[in-house]
């Protein structure tokens, strides 16, 4: 089976796109996964390690073709508050629980979770159900984006 062996970040625009895959959040963080593009191109995602694919990234196939990654619409909870301070407070509580969040200028999007939705309501926030692409923050320890360089582990722990 044809393999996707590398990924270019959304900012890198090199060459034409041959097909497109639309994936939900869970399926955009994989190492190996059989895929089928919207135009029928079948291939195996076969990366050296699990990698978080972002909206607009491009998968590079071993035969030189390129497949654009799109984020699928998902059921999300949209959190809003009446002030920026309250929104920051809610963001702090969500971060304290290590939840994936999508930060926008005036709202926060999270995956549906009735327990968390109740918690943010108790903090004074409003919660609405929306359907949107979910592309959350990487987090402080996620590393430098799409840098695929490995230094090895050849030092002595002795």
Task: Mark where each language-model region is.
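Short, well-ordered loop/turn sites that connect or cap secondary structure elements
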Residues: 53, 59-61
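Short glycine-/aliphatic-rich beta-strand segments at the starts of folded cytosolic domains
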Residues: 67-81
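Intrinsically disordered, low-complexity, positively charged segments
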Residues: 1-50
């Amino acid at each position: 089976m044809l393999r996707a062996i590398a990924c270019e970040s959304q900012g890198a625009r090199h060459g034409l796109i041959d097909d497109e895959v639309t994936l939900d959040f869970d399926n955009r963080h994989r190492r190996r996964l059989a895929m089928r593009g919207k135009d029928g191109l079948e291939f195996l995602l076969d990366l050296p390690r699990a990698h978080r694919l972002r909206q607009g990234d491009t998968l590079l196939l071993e035969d030189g073709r390129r497949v654009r990654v799109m984020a699928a619409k998902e059921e999300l909870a949209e959190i809003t508050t009446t002030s920026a301070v309250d929104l920051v407070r809610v963001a702090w509580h969500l971060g304290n629980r290590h939840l994936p969040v999508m930060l926008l200028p005036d709202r926060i999007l999270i995956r549906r979770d009735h327990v968390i939705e109740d918690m943010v309501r108790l903090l004074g926030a409003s919660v609405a159900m929306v359907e949107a692409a979910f592309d959350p923050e990487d987090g402080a320890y996620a590393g430098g984006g799409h840098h695929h360089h490995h230094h090895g582990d050849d030092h002595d722990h002795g």
